Design a protein with these regions (language model features):
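Hydrophobic alpha-helical transmembrane segments and immediately flanking/interface helices
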Residues: 105-133
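Interfacial loop-to-transmembrane junctions
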Residues: 130-155
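Juxtamembrane boundary at the C-terminal end of a transmembrane helix
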Residues: 158-167
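Membrane-helix interface/capping segments
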Residues: 32, 56-80
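Core segments of transmembrane alpha-helices
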Residues: 51, 90-104
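Transmembrane alpha-helical segments that form the membrane-embedded catalytic/substrate-channel core
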Residues: 48-64, 126-134
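Long, highly hydrophobic alpha-helical transmembrane signal-anchor segments
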Residues: 1-54
Length: 167
């Protein structure tokens, strides 16, 4: 069981790393990125893929509650799907609470040449959260395919922010 989970995590990490590298390489340094305000604006825009995924998760949860009639989450009538989606939403918020400020701090502290990497990491993080959600719906072990890459993306942003502000 652990071997399967670890294997899925490694596959997800490899795919996310490759996607980050390819995407960053395809993004030109944005005009005006020498300005901290522009860099922060770009980093906020880079968070939109993850915010869109989170909004879809919340919308799905609301629709499931409406369709099932399980309006009171404290009544003990939540289906397995409602429980899974709630865990997905909770974990996404936990990871975003690390990723979002770290990405903004990295963008603010780094120079313009870092911005393609910042933007690409935002896209990869959002995609990884979507893979996590789909994986969890398939099987709890399959969530590792998206969980590992999104957490490593959060740690990468945090490390890059620390490095940018330590220089």
């Amino acid at each position: 069981v652990r071997l399967v989970s670890a294997s899925l995590a490694l596959i997800g990490l490899a795919a996310a790393g490759l996607a980050w590298w390819l995407l960053a390489g395809s993004i030109a340094e944005p005009r005006g990125a020498s300005s901290m305000a522009v860099r922060i604006g770009l980093a906020l825009a880079a968070l939109l893929p993850a915010v869109i995924v989170l909004a879809a998760m919340i919308l799905a949860q609301m629709a499931l509650r409406f369709a099932s009639g399980a309006f009171d989450p404290l009544a003990g009538r939540d289906s397995l799907l409602l429980h899974v989606n709630q865990r997905v939403i909770g974990n996404t918020l936990e990871q975003m609470s690390i990723f979002a400020p770290a990405l903004l701090a990295w963008a603010a502290g780094a120079g313009a040449p870092a911005m393609p990497w910042v933007i690409a990491l935002g896209v990869v993080f959002g995609a990884a959260r979507l893979v996590f959600w789909i994986g969890y719906l398939v099987h709890p072990m399959a969530r590792a395919l998206g969980m590992a890459p999104s957490f490593v993306a959060a740690l990468a942003a945090l490390g890059a922010a620390i490095a940018a502000w330590s220089a």
